[in-house]
Amino acid sequence: TISVTEDEVLGIGGENIQGFYAAMKYFQSLDNPNNKKFVEAFKAKYGPKSVIGDVTQAAYLGPWLWKMTVEKAGSFDVDKVAAASPDIEFKEAPEGYVKIHKNHHLWSKTRIGQSLPDGQFKLIAESPKLIEPDPFPKGYQ
């Protein structure tokens, strides 16, 4: 599956989906200092049983990337912000380092995880470097 995150597993029950694979850029179980800090703060705010999926982490990134882009643009003007967005880097992202491409999508790593009975994902594979975003690939039209 490519659309089941920790959020959905919470409702389905980890024991009911154990062993399924998911391709995401973020799993709550990622072992890096940024993610550990993020998960700890999230659980302190929303409770120890709360989970964080790829979509939640992406929602967290948005305001930070917007802030950095507005600061670079020196303006809230949408055209100036859009023009300033390429090459904005977020080194403290829970998923790890990300960067905005000139097409306004993120360079990020891709990961494959296997679901565990506790509702988390075991990291099985990770791209060795950031993947260039291609939101409109030729040949799919």
Where are these regions (language model features)?
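Extracytosolic ligand-binding ectodomains
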Residues: 1-141
